[in-house]
Amino acid sequence: MRTGAYTVHQTLTPEAASVLKQSLTLARRRGHSQVTPLHVASTLLTSSRSNLFRRACLKSNPFTALGRQMAHPSLHCRALELCFNVSLNRLPTNPNPLFQTQPSLSNALVAALKRAQAHQRRGCVEQQQSQQNQPFLAVKVELEQLVVSILDDPSVSRVMREAGLSSVSVKSNIEDDSSVVSPVFYGSSSSVGVFSSPCSPSSSENNQGGGTLSPNPSKIWHAHLTNHHSFEQNPFFHFPKGKTFTPDQAFPVREDANPVIEVLLGKKNNKKRNTVIVGDSVSLTEGVVAKLMGRIERGEVPDDLKQTHFIKFQFSQVGLNFMKKEDIEGQVRELKRKIDSFTSWGGKGVIVCLGDLDWAVWGGGNSASSSNYSAADHLVEEIGRLVYDYSNTGAKVWLLGTASYQTYMRCQMKQPPLDVHWALQAVSIPSGGLSLTLHASSSEMASQVMEMKPFRVKEEEEGAREEEEEDKLNFCGECAFNYEKEAKAFISAQHKILPPWLQPHGDNNNINQKDELSGLRKKWNRFCQALHHKKPSMTAWRAEQSSSVLPGSLMDSSLKQNSRASSSVAKFRRQNSCTIEFSFGSNRQEGLKKTDELSLDGFKSNNDEGVKTKITLALGHSPFPSDSENSEEEEPEKAIKMSKLLEKLHENIPWQKDVLPSIVEAMEESVKRSKRKDAWMLVSGNDVTAKRRLAITLTTSLFGSHENMLKINLRTSKASEACEELKNALKKKEEVVILIERVDLADAQFMNILVDRFEAGDLDGFQGKKSQIIFLLTREDDECVENEHFVIPMVLNCNKSGSGLVNNKRKPEYDAAPTMIKKKNPRIEEDDDESNVACDISNIKKEFSRQLKFESNALDLNLRVDADEDEEEEAKPATEISSGFEERFLDSIQNRFDFTVLSDEDITKFFVTKIKDSCEEILGQREERFGFTVDAELIEKFYKGCGFFANGLFEEWVKEVFQRGLVTVKNGGKEGISVINLCLGGIDMIDQGEVYEEEEGFMGTCLPNRIHVSFVD
């Protein structure tokens, strides 16, 4: 079925194909497994790009047909939309639409598409019989024929009848509209003629005087330009191959610049008057800037923007990397001088055009003056200072920049965010077509992407498309560096061969250079795919970096095309609920099956013509690059995933909010830049709960389930069992977060496994196993609490006597910021001391044997022999790593973070706030009549027991269990109650060090399933 859909899609014009893509998006968003004619009809009715169906429905309105003017004609279309919506709601849906497979085309929709194709072909055959000189060409189905065929479907006709419309009448109106002139779009022809549709009048009716068809040009403009038809469908506007026809050349398009003007005037946000234009491609964003400049030059703007000058202040990544601090400051001074010269005369305004803002977020710190100096960050600060200064003076100075979606996401993730620092307001420009992607079924294949550009005539052959795809920059960072080096050598060698007066100039020289550089790109593309097995491209390498290598004309003609084309990948953004990408064309090269078998065959183009093609959607995938899918995952999708990860971390570990952005940034860098698929993090500090919650949040956010997490506590686990668990996880699990607590207590065998994995990157790579593993190592953990996995007993003590607290030994007031991890039961402390002595002796033996294994010629004489000497000192783990081998391994982990709790105020507030809010929700805010307190030891139990369940589960426990206890208090009568204290249940039990065991806690956690209520007089 999907292969048939792909074949049918090749026979559609871009406008009809766009409707089909939107229908696929609608079905996917609603969770439907198939795309039906109802989806297509609903899309046709609500589509903003084509109002053909809506206009025909308005003409078919019974009030309009009888000659009476309806008060609101669009209400009938609104009723029809509701009818289609009800019909779509009746279709069976997937309970989890985000993780379902891609929708396929239903039999009814395939039949409708084939009917449209047959009607279109029948009309063309009739035309060609009357015009014998025209050869038979492949015909593409137009939107009119698609609408007529959809209306013939019984399900659509039934919905039309329910809304009071006749599908026959609507079809008649569509045929009448298309009979004015309806050119047929042919798939491949250098000379395109004009043909009418099957429903058009005969040629004799249109042209009584001759045998050639000469339609009225005014009708063509009315029927096609006002209906947003693409120029590539209209043969009257046929342009040579490769030429781009902009809409401004045919009729003025001013709507795109209106949002920018509103931002500049402060209509949307008075505090943010600077603009960043966000779009899929450079041509879209630069086109909006050009429209704005044209309108200001013509004076077609409000008075506040008239007499406004433009100043270009644009940079590139490569140029900034070689600029010193003095250069940046000089450029800013020159910019300020120009601004002052314009604004000092009659209150004129200035718009500073910053161009593409990728230099602000992708620029590195490789400066010529200092290794710690970043020219990009310095320039960002200077521009921010400039914005602040002019905003205080009231001068008319605006910033105008452009950005792709991935660049804008990075702008928001900077600290501080660039839109806040520069007072930027984003203006999103929709792309010319939706992004539906067709991937070949081969697991090693990446699909070719064809952008649906509405004003560009595409008549390239299949071979030309393959060459263009092969000419793109899709190699890794290492090969990109080698390509840039070779390209620089080629350019410099050309200039050194001949003297300047003998060197060739003009277009021929540029064409030759472009051909040579294109050959270099193809060479390094094939070499990278063969040698590096399609490693993910380094995001630090971008097409703009080649501006230092290529002349300006070559940069505009080749690399900018590549950068535009590479931006059309599947994305999910905040403003777009679901965007998919369709891709056409031949299949690309398959990667080598084995990386260790490198031969000359790897450099040959290996095209498989017979590979079955299907529609695939990259939803719910891991953010890590995989060989089985397109390794160049689009940046916006990664940025959104990382943004959601940061939100989840802030939700679960708010007391470590200062460290969380660095963790998310490290995860993102590990995903994008690391050559290995594993991510490694080393977390130190005494906050055990935060470390465990970090692991569980990473697991659920990136891999979707708690089952993809492995916890190994080297303090409590046996060495052999820990090694076996780690080996099994590396062999069997493809996606897993491995939490290794107290890695400083690891023995030699366990450490060898970690070191081998760290050095190899993929331990099972030679077996063809594709795994995505996050290693989270912890050390310097605080001492574990005894019985931490048992259910916490709780009781609500309601004191009616007004005497205050129940037990003076506790510190129950949550306002007093109870001290955590400070108290210890004397009996437990005694047992710990005895066990520590025995543990020390055994650990000394392990340390001694381990040193003999790793450093046979060196012996550490500083080992503790008498454990009793350190009784007065602070307790330390007895088997911390002292060997340089293990220390060097831990030091080699770049992502190192510290989770240390210095103050328990934030932790106390985190738990008490949720409990207090729940109490006020049930009992009401009666603080003047009674007080609510939480035992400090209970908060400590909460803190140490909530490591392996998320914040959402704790909130669920508060609503289901804790509030049930409050209802008991409420029903028992809260009159006369002075203090309600939530504390540990059974005071004598706690003081004697006994264990309160319950069969099972709330959903398998340490939280109880019930809370006892006690009324104390």
Curated annotation (Swiss-Prot):
Keywords, ordered alphabetically: Hydrolase, Nucleus, Repeat, Transcription, Transcription regulation
Annotated Gene Ontology cellular component terms: nucleus
Positions of the UniProt region annotated as Repeat 2: 105-183
Phenotype on disruption: Reduced drought tolerance and hypersensitivity to salt stress, resulting in poor growth in normal soil.
Subunit structure, as described in the record: Interacts probably with TPL/TPR in an EAR-motif dependent manner.
Primary role: Probable component of a transcriptional corepressor complex involved in salt tolerance through modulation of reactive oxygen species levels, abscisic acid-dependent stomatal closure, photosynthesis and K(+) /Na(+) homeostasis. Has an in vitro ATPase activity.
Name listed for the protein in its UniProt record: Protein SMAX1-LIKE 4
Species for this entry: Arabidopsis thaliana (Mouse-ear cress)
Gene (UniProt): SMXL4
